[in-house]
Amino acid sequence: VLILSIPLLEKAKADWNSSELSRIRVSTATGLDSLPSEKATSSGTSINYIINAFGIGYTTSTLTIDDSDVKVKKTSSVLDLSVMTGIQSFTFQAGYGWLLSHKWDHPSYDTTTNSSEGGSGFFNVGVDLGLFELTGGYRVWSILHNVNLSRIKSNGRTQTSDNKGHLAYKEMYLGLGYTFF
């Protein structure tokens, strides 16, 4: 069935703009482009569903900062909305992800996110490979946060502090898409 559908899909693609076909894209973060003063790595995944040039998706990213033998993980999730256009075998997608959640995992402190706002802007480029599509993209994160850190000291007292700040970093993504009607 797959072999028989390829010529039909190619005929349909010749009649339509490549951005007007429905597709599902899954991407993973492949590198971090920021935070020069800190040792940091990032990991993340993104899934998008695009129909008639409009997309909706979900992206999560974990930034791990290695600061003097303490690894702090900062995880953010966003709801993506995007638009897509294309020419011949290439597609271009741009969008913004609204922050759904932001939390920290600290080895020495209990953490509670008091407030967070922001999100991430992104763009992706796709290359048509028939039924599949190879994608690459760039995402810029910008999050304002207020995180409460607390721990019990050796004397039994609880030590708390608020960490207010702006988290900004950039990631590169690679992925694969599946095109259908």
In which residue ranges do the predicted regions lie?
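Classical Sec-dependent N-terminal signal peptides that target proteins to the secretory pathway
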Residues: 1-15
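A mature extracytoplasmic/lumenal domain signature
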Residues: 60, 96-98, 138-140
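Short loop/turn motifs that connect adjacent beta-strands in outer-membrane beta-barrel proteins
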Residues: 12-20, 49-50, 83-92, 127-136, ...
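Flexible, solvent-exposed loop segments that connect beta-strands
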Residues: 27-41, 59-77, 100-117, 144-167
